[in-house]
A protein has these predicted regions:
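Short beta-strand->alpha-helix junction loop in the catalytic core
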Residues: 118-119, 137-146, 185-187
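Conserved donor-binding/catalytic core segment of Leloir-type glycosyltransferases
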Residues: 113, 150-168, 174-180
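Short hydrophobic beta-strand element within catalytic cores of glycosyltransferases
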Residues: 237-241, 247
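Acidic anion/phosphate-binding donor-loop and adjacent secondary structure
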Residues: 92-94, 124, 138-156
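Active-site proximal beta-strand in glycosyltransferases
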Residues: 3-4, 61-64, 74-92, 112-113
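Aromatic "clamp/platform" in nucleotide-sugar-dependent glycosyltransferases that forms part
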Residues: 220
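A short, active-site helix/loop in glycosyltransferases that binds the activated sugar's phosphate group
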Residues: 92, 107-133, 141
Length: 267
């Protein structure tokens, strides 16, 4: 089977550092190849080049992983599906300009690989999607890539590993002595003087994440966060916000959920 996977084209695949969607696409492609499938990764911002690459490869199936390319969906004459990785998909009140893309999904009604049941319900309730077009397919992780230690080097340290931005809310927690941060910074409110480790490479992620006791992810919006799966692969527990709970069994002792009402009083 020949499969085309379409990425955003905004950074390399595989990424050198930050880039969850790009990492997912790379791991997905390699997993499919291991199963004997022929896989094409298309990673360009030019929609005409996307369509040309699909035509040349002549795949049996096309998987689009970039919401903006919903406009290409009617122009692809192959079996196909979309996956949205938009962090606020379960929070319509936070969509802002994304609502235009969401409305396009409603208009076109593509097949959608939903990252959680919650996301599936959003499409059903807000866009009246037919059930047969929605498929729940949570993210996975390449567990073989991660170093694992029974005894971490820093068991009393927690790691906040994510792009430092408004959605992830790192600035609210940067004065916690036991919390360390890694990720590229796009939030000017964050002070790099406090336990900041810079932007980790993929090699650092695979090797060093296991050295910490827990992963912290207290975003105000998530789809199905890859970094949580990476934390599990490296042997960490997780401390999460209500918005990062997708696909998790909250009865597990290594998963701690902080209610939103307590987010601003953490010390």
């Amino acid at each position: 089977m020949k499969i085309s996977i379409i990425g955003p084209g905004l950074m390399p695949i595989p990424p050198k550092g930050w880039g969850a969607v790009e990492s997912l696409i790379w791991d997905m492609a390699n997993a499919l190849k291991d199963l004997g499938q022929e896989v094409q990764i298309i990673n360009t911002t030019d929609p005409n080049k996307v369509l040309a690459a699909i035509k040349e490869f002549d795949p049996d199936f096309v998987h689009i992983n970039y919401d903006d390319f919903i406009v290409l969906y009617p122009h692809i004459d192959k079996p196909k599906a979309m996956t949205s990785h938009f962090g606020y998909l379960e929070r319509p009140d936070m969509m802002n300009g994304y609502v235009n893309i969401f409305n396009k999904f409603q208009e076109i009604r593509p097949n959608v690989f939903c990252l959680s049941e919650g996301i599936k319900n959003i499409y059903k309730v807000f866009s009246n999607f037919p059930e047969e077009k929605l498929f729940v397919t949570p993210n996975g992780v390449n567990v073989d890539a991660f170093n694992f230690k029974e005894e971490p080097a820093h068991p009393h340290r927690s790691m906040y590993l994510a792009k430092v931005d408004y959605r992830k809310r790192q600035h609210l927690f940067q004065n916690i002595d036991s919390l360390w941060f890694a990720g590229n910074i796009v939030d000017e409110r964050y002070d790099t003087k406090n336990n900041y480790l810079g932007e980790w490479s993929k090699e650092q992620l695979y090797k060093e994440l296991t050295d910490y006791g827990n992963l912290v992810l207290l975003s105000d919006g998530e789809a199905h966060s890859l970094v949580i799966m990476e934390a599990f692969a490296a042997g960490l527990g997780v401390v999460i916000s209500e918005y990062a709970r997708a696909n998790l069994d909250l009865d597990k002792k290594f998963i701690t959920l902080l209610p939103e009402k307590k987010i601003n009083v953490i010390d």
